[in-house]
């Protein structure tokens, strides 16, 4: 699993290469017949990976907030790169004395701040249960555009899904 981020970077680089001049174009961009349900190219795989494994980030009246579960990592770093990228890095090393084993884990995640958010105002907090929260306050002018209203909930009194027994009951009564 450690090589997965490197694999995605390689895939992105390959996607930028000229497509027709490569003898491997068909291999990387045209799926075999048996893979009808699989993504069509590396960009789709990268988008799927981003959507599937991206931590929940929210933008609300308090600002931009990103949460990560890092309870298994002891060495944590949060850095700001290029005034718009937040880099989160975590390491964990464990040594078992009984069996002489050693395990090491490392992650590196990059997040691009939404446009207009100031990187120098990034703050991070770590809760006692291992949740890292990265926050950035809303830039001036954004708070006026974020409107909140409460929506009333109307109860229908009917089930959303019809039970499987209803068709049998009707057939039995006929």
From Swiss-Prot:
Positions of modified residues (Phosphothreonine): 152
The entry's keywords: Phosphoprotein, Stress response
Disordered, as annotated region: 152-174
sHSP domain mapped to chain residues: 44-154
Listed InterPro entries: A-crystallin/Hsp20_dom, Alpha-crystallin/sHSP_animal, HSP20-like_chaperone
PROSITE patterns: SHSP
Keyword presence, Phosphoprotein: yes
Domain of life per record: Eukaryota
GO BP: chaperone-mediated protein folding; determination of adult lifespan; protein refolding; response to heat; response to oxidative stress
Pfam families listed in its UniProt record: HSP20 (PF00011)
Natural source organism: Drosophila melanogaster (Fruit fly)
Keyword Phosphoprotein: yes
Residue spans of biased composition, Basic and acidic residues class: 159-174
Similarity comment: family membership: Belongs to the small heat shock protein (HSP20) family.
GO molecular function, one term: identical protein binding
Any one GO CC term of the record: nucleus
Name of this protein: Heat shock protein 22
Encoding gene (name): Hsp22
């Amino acid at each position: 699993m450690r090589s997965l981020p490197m694999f995605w970077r390689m895939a992105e680089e390959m996607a930028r290469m000229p497509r027709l001049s490569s003898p491997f174009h068909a291999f990387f961009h045209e799926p075999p017949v048996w893979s009808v349900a699989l993504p069509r190219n590396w960009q789709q795989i990268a988008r799927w990976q981003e959507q599937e494994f991206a931590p929940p980030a929210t933008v609300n009246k308090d600002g931009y907030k990103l949460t990560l579960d890092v309870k298994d990592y002891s060495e944590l770093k949060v850095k700001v790169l290029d005034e718009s990228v937040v880099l989160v890095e975590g390491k964990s090393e464990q040594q078992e004395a009984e069996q002489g084993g050693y395990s090491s884990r490392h992650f590196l995640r990059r997040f691009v701040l939404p446009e207009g958010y100031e990187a120098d105002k990034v703050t991070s907090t770590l809760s006692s249960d291992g949740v890292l929260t990265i926050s950035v306050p809303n830039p001036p002018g954004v708070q006026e555009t974020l409107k909140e209203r409460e929506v009333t909930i109307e109860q229908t009194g009917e089930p959303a899904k019809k039970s499987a027994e209803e068709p049998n009951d009707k057939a039995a009564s006929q």
